[in-house]
Amino acid sequence: MLKPFLPLLIFVLFFTFANAQKKPAAEFYKSGITFKNNNKLTEALTAFNKAVLFKKDYDSAYVEIGNIYIKSGNIDGGLSNYKKALAINPTYTEALIGMGKIYRDAKPNYDSALIYYNAALKTDSTNKETFYALAWTHNAKKEFDKAIPYAIKALEIDNKYKPAYGELGYAYRSTKKFAECIEQLKKNLAVSVVDVAFLYSGYAYTELNNKEGALQQYEELKKINERMAAALKQKIDKMEVQD
């Protein structure tokens, strides 16, 4: 009598078991997040590892494990766990960015870093850090013209994002596009006042031997950041010596 119902019974038991496995996995993951937020990384790592024991395809837990390994200096451990997450979910943005950071910083391979950052960009085009990372990596490869639009895009997302100004200023200076640099920074300064934008704009004016323009940037910069203003003034003073 039970034979016709046996396949259904097996399915129900399997489904029940699978759901039972998911519940402790989610609980361990949640406790891992709590430990992480309280900077208890050893306890967090234990919790996340228990989560993936109960749920082998827990991509978020693998990413958290990878992040902890990277933070503790275990680069290979981080790499391995990011790869596990991407094997489950190839479009997992955080894992793609994590891989990009490894190949940008810990295991320098800029071509590989660009592959992962560009993949991350396809899944999330609103992340300023990804655009910044692309600008940084292109600058590191001395591909300065390619770096410029990525730095600009990062600033379109967050006009006060200072790391992007650093890459933008470096790329413009390396290509000697000083007039273009000034025009772009004028646009940024029209959106919001940012000290580093005045600084790089002032440097560009000195490169064009435009002392008046450089001094204007210096006066504005002095109002908001005296230390940066002093650095710019040193550059301007050298122009005066050369006159």
Q: What does each model-found stretch correspond to?
A:
Residues 24-26, 59-60, 93-94, 128-129, ...:
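Helix-start (N-cap) detector for alpha-helical repeat units in TPR-like alpha-solenoids
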